[in-house]
Amino acid sequence: MAVLALLFCLATFPSCILSQVQLKESGPGLVAPSQSLSITCTVSGFSLTGYGVNWVRQPPGKGLEWLGTIWGNGSTDYNSTLKSRLTITKDNSKSQVFLKMNSLQTDDTARYYCASVSIYYYGRSDKYFTLDYWGQGTSVTVSS
């Protein structure tokens, strides 16, 4: 009976399998120019071995900027313009994903978000995915 209920849930509401998903970012708040930024994203409600997690930021008054993704198998994709400064890692056992960015400048001031990937597919040369679950974000200011 429980199996039938689960199948009904999945068939009717595909997102129900991730209905309890939560993501929470924690960061330093203030970072001095030229220093490094480290942010942790702690997730619950799903396993990091089965889903990708993205890092996205939004500078004040500007749009969202994708930083990178770490996939369930541990492989990573990065924004090509920031790739040399970024490292994304994770600890599956602690359900945590880590963003490290080096050589910060004032234009790195932004709100930083982690977001989980629920659906993705490959195009001819690109990956496409939906970011259905977001953390509340953590504000980072780069200033001396």
UniProtKB/Swiss-Prot annotation:
Key words, A-Z: Adaptive immunity, Immunity, Immunoglobulin, Signal
Signal peptide: 1-19
Highest taxon of the lineage: Eukaryota
GO biological process: immunoglobulin mediated immune response
Domain Ig-like per the UniProt entry, residue ranges: 20-130
SUPFAM superfamilies: Immunoglobulin
Entry GO terms, CC: extracellular region; immunoglobulin complex
One annotated GO molecular function: antigen binding
Disulfide linkage: none
Further remark: The sequence shown is translated from a differentiated gene isolated from a myeloma that secretes IgG2b.
Protein name: Ig heavy chain V region MOPC 141
Organism of derivation: Mus musculus (Mouse)
